[in-house]
């Protein structure tokens, strides 16, 4: 390849004149290249331009390029993963740190004979604390601190990820009735969390008003086999305490209706179960007043939970509640995601 061939080499990248004139695309590209100063090299520089290209293609470079083309493509290099590197430190190099820590509180960690310290460099006063002996933190101490800091962070993160995150449900913004986890299972509150100071007495008519009696009422949920949900757009109160059954199956208990919504508790003492759904331990819903399953209303912004609480007196809704609980069993409808 000589300098006389430079014109022919440049012509390889150009179209014939008649095709260039007839092609609007080539004209647009040429205009764009001229605007950005990306045109072809001038005629005066053709000799130097071709000479540089010829000189760069020497025999050694050509062999290297040919050899690389024959080789298999290299594996893509992974990005640096801090968590992976930390796990390697925890798993593979743990014995080094244990050996370093168990050296009778003296920094005798020998790393390529560069950090060996004699006992003469340490303070001989036994009353001085070990942390006060070396004011200057060396590389080994810094490495140890980094290890334990990362180890405790990893352990704390593992404990947090192992436990289910809890969302505390509050009713009337005055008491936590139960704990519902992200796995949508209702957990029983321990006995220490129950409100023992809350007196269980028959409520007066003034306490039936959700705006008056709920401010001082604190109820806890006991039995998880008979949870009732009132899902209605008319309901404005998100709190309800009601209709109870003990763990032994004895339904002859009074109902604390101080937190029951107005649309559930009627003036005649009869309970309207048209908008009340039963939730069993598997979080399956079924209607109480009708045997057909009912899904919660999608227009309502919340669901009212009627939890059970034990009282000493009976009310008029006892018999009706007992019959409804015994008569209607939950049917198969999709689970309610709380």
From Swiss-Prot:
It comes from Saccharomyces cerevisiae (strain ATCC 204508 / S288c) (Baker's yeast). Regulatory subunit, binds to type-1 protein phosphatase. Functions with HEX2/REG1 and SNF1 protein kinase to regulate growth. Might regulate SNF1 directly or indirectly. GO terms for molecular function: protein phosphatase regulator activity. GO terms for cellular component: protein phosphatase type 1 complex. It holds the Pfam family GATA_AreA. InterPro entries: AreA_GATA. GO terms for biological process: cellular response to glucose stimulus; regulation of cellular response to glucose starvation. It comes from the Eukaryota. Residues 1-21 are annotated as: Disordered. This is Protein REG2.
